[in-house]
């Protein structure tokens, strides 16, 4: 794909349809069946600590990244946590994911955020390679999940 036909946009209040389409894309790429909660989408797009950047090919959502700004208690400022990043399967490996991360990093710099972090499962070699290629530093950690 020629990237000159891809546009990038930071979603905000009023872009609920685009966010809805991104959630459907996440479901497709991650092979999940998450519901689209319209109320949560509206609330998230009105939350200044939430960032959603989307890649469009013409008017179709073909990729996106979501992240949360988390206030630090041990140092001034905050950090950014990437929650999800996905690109439509047919558009992967064309620079769209890298550009989404680059756009998020620029948004962080503009806000004075000095650290961005993301989790990738060790078994997801593609994701691990992707973040390493972008210059991310890897740390061995364990994630614990509690079902409530």
Predicted segments with their positions:
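Conserved GNAT acetyl-CoA-binding A-motif
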Residues: 101, 109-120
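Conserved active-site alpha-helix within GNAT-family acetyltransferase domains
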Residues: 98, 122-140, 145-146
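Active-site rim helix/loop that mediates acceptor-substrate recognition in acyltransferases
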Residues: 31-52
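Conserved beta-strand in the GNAT
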Residues: 54, 60-69, 86
């Amino acid at each position: 794909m020629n990237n000159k036909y891809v546009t990038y946009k930071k979603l905000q209040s009023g872009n609920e349809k685009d966010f809805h389409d991104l959630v459907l894309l996440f479901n497709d790429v991650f092979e999940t069946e998450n519901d689209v909660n319209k109320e949560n989408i509206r609330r998230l797009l009105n939350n200044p600590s939430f960032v959603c950047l989307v890649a469009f090919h013409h008017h179709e959502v073909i990729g996106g990244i979501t992240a949360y700004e988390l206030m630090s208690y041990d140092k001034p400022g905050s950090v950014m946590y990437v929650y999800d990043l996905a690109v439509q399967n047919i558009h992967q490996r064309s620079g769209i994911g890298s550009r989404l991360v680059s756009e998020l990093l620029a948004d962080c710099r503009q806000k004075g955020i000095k650290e961005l972090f993301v989790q990738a499962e060790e078994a997801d070699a593609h994701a691990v390679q992707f973040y390493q290629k972008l210059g991310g530093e890897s740390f061995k950690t364990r994630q614990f999940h509690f079902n409530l």
